[in-house]
């Protein structure tokens, strides 16, 4: 089975990059299932009903979220109405369960979403290590894919090794820069520290460059605006064939 996981889709340029590339990538790599992180889809903060509908129409099967889960009020209705939006399991007030189990040709695949706690400025978060243990104990599945939305690479690597051999993949999201450390861990789990961002190419992790530069050089803090110009598509392809697993980076 081949799974395409698309990195944080950021703003209108991210959505454009998604719509322009997803069909070709699915065809070229014989993709069976598409998962995408959508927490930045609406101007960098959250997701709307309209964007959700567009994502479904373009071929995404499951949407994961992150620290901007509640960035748009539409999320509350979407969580009530839709089953394929997965929000971080270690939110204490998570109205769902932080995972979604789906069936593909008789195979059960469980997608788990977790938030890191290091440098994430949310003291209410539960421990992602303990929460994922609880999910794995309670939910029996043929395959498990974990989206770990976290800032610190050390926390991501630690969770990857902690879950090595127990899940099929631990995929880092949030930092918006694709890392080159994709690998198969010693006990068979596929790992990458960050899948990267699908969005503006020449902004600062999605934001208009001058806004961020002014913050660093002049101390001027302005509202973030999505960068314009060129765009990029980042993701990974997971081959979770039981005989030989692999992870391949995609950058367009």
Q: How should these model regions be labeled?
A:
Residues 1-252:
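Acidic, metal/ion-coordinating pockets
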């Amino acid at each position: 089975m081949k799974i395409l996981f698309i990195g944080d889709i950021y703003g209108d340029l991210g959505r454009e990059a998604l719509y322009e590339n997803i069909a070709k990538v699915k065809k070229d790599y014989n993709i069976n299932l598409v998962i995408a992180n959508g927490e930045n889809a609406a101007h960098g903060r959250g997701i709307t009903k309209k964007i959700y509908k567009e994502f479904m129409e373009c071929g995404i099967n499951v949407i994961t979220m992150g620290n901007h889960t509640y960035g748009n009020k539409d999320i509350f209705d979407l969580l009530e109405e839709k089953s394929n939006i997965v929000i971080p399991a270690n939110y204490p007030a998570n109205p769902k369960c932080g995972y979604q189990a789906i069936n593909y040709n008789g195979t059960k695949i469980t997608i788990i979403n977790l938030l890191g706690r290091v440098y994430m400025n949310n003291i209410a978060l539960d421990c992602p290590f303990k929460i994922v243990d609880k999910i794995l104990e309670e939910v029996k599945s043929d395959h498990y894919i974990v989206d770990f939305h976290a800032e610190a690479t050390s926390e991501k690597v630690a969770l990857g090794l902690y879950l090595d051999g127990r899940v099929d993949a631990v995929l880092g999201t949030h930092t918006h820069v694709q890392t080159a450390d994709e690998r198969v861990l010693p006990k068979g789990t596929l790992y990458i520290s960050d899948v990267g961002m699908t969005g503006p190419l020449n902004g600062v992790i999605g934001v208009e460059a001058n806004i961020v530069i002014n913050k660093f050089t002049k101390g001027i803090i302005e509202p973030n605006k999505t960068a314009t110009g060129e765009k990029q598509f980042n993701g990974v392809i997971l081959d979770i064939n039981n005989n030989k697993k692999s992870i391949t980076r995609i950058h367009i």
